Amino acid sequence: MKSATKSKILCIHGYAESGELFSVKLRALRERMADSVDFYFPTGPIELDKAKDELNGSGFDALSTVFSSSPASHRRGWWRINEYADTKQLEPTKAFEYLASYIKEHGPFDGILGFSQGTNLAANLAALVTIPKYQEYFSQPPFRFALFFSGYFRPLLMDGAVHATKLDLPTLHLLGKYDTVLSTETSTTLVRACKDAQVLFHPAAHQIPAPHAYVEPAADFIDFFSREDWPIISKHISLIVPTKKVNTTSAQTSLNNVEHDLISKIMSRSFKGGINVVVSDLQMFNEYKRIFGPKVLSLVVTDGQEPDTYSENVHYTPNFKGALAYLEAYQNSIGRIYVIGDKKLLTLGMLCRCTKRIIAITDAEDKFISQSSAQQVSGSLPFLEHSKEWLKAKSSQIRQWTGQSRLKHMSQDNSGEPVTMKLQMWERL
């Protein structure tokens, strides 16, 4: 792919770091997207000194702990943390001037990415360039998307005033479950400032997590929002996550039938707006097609595979974008929309501003069970594994949604031991 066709992302490093160091930390993502994205890493204009800039008195004192892990040559910042006390507003003039010069030389950019202190600067910059005056100053049109690692938000001054405190663009927030530098409450300030926020928890602290915990969903997010304007569906799209089929014993077959009946009730529930649609890949369609009744239209994403036979009442499309285009064209005659499929479909469904509900089968400890291996899925979709951290509907609401009152049935784990499976539903934040 030619460089001219690549998307460009501006990456803003954290406190007491540098663009060079941040580039190293994002190596896995850079390599994953080398053919489609160019990442740019400016270095903050403020040279930091451990003796002067690791001071108390700031609401973000804990950020100074990064000094212990940053080489002296990489200790740069966008402003000094002791200049930004809880009661003080800050105008980081040097940071804005430097970024304006940097963007003029290397931009404009499609997206913006930040870590820690860099998320606050990135969020404020993204808000500013929605204003024509500052689009001209920074030589940057509104960003199409943003990714925030360990983020927080406090308004920064520009020309002596706060101009925007809300972000109306797709954002992906990656938060460490064990972050002791920024509290969940502090991180929530940025989530709440974003109109279209997607949140993924990863099993790490205040850091860029291990590649398996973020690269695939981040790459899917960037690919979706950077390439072109994809179809937007006004209706809610729900994910259905089935249990993993571990064996084919008669007992397991019976239990699978219970789950099939449960999913059938969910998908075939009548809706006055039109016929229900279920989006799946070929494997999932072949497994569940017998339970799709006349009230359900199957929309199958072939992804380069050729169906053995072409079934009636089924629309085949080569990719997920084609599925969205079909749903957009016929959404006035569609009732409810469901996605049931492998990790790729689930991730795309979650990150494409479509999904409002997740319907999943879990074990008694709320551990997510999937068609993919637990390690793969917990890396891409860790919030499902830690369901208690997310808003869940009441049992009465779940019963109304599923059309039946029995929310549990018995299944087996990989060793054949019996486990209690539970139907649960999450609302997207």
UniProtKB/Swiss-Prot annotation:
**Annotated catalytic residues:** 116 (charge relay system), 179 (charge relay system), 206 (charge relay system)
- The source's superkingdom equals Eukaryota
Q: Which SUPFAM superfamilies match?
A: alpha/beta-Hydrolases
Q: Report the EC code(s) recorded for this entry.
A: 3.1.-.-
Q: Which Pfam families match?
A: FSH1
GO CC annotations, alphabetized = cell division site; cell tip; cytoplasm; cytosol; nucleus
Localization (cell): Cytoplasm; Nucleus
Q: Keyword annotations for this protein?
A: Cytoplasm, Hydrolase, Nucleus
Q: Which family does it belong to?
A: Belongs to the AB hydrolase 3 family.
Q: What is the recorded name of this protein?
A: Uncharacterized hydrolase C22A12.06c
Mind giving the lineage of the organism this protein is from? Eukaryota, Fungi, Dikarya, Ascomycota, Taphrinomycotina
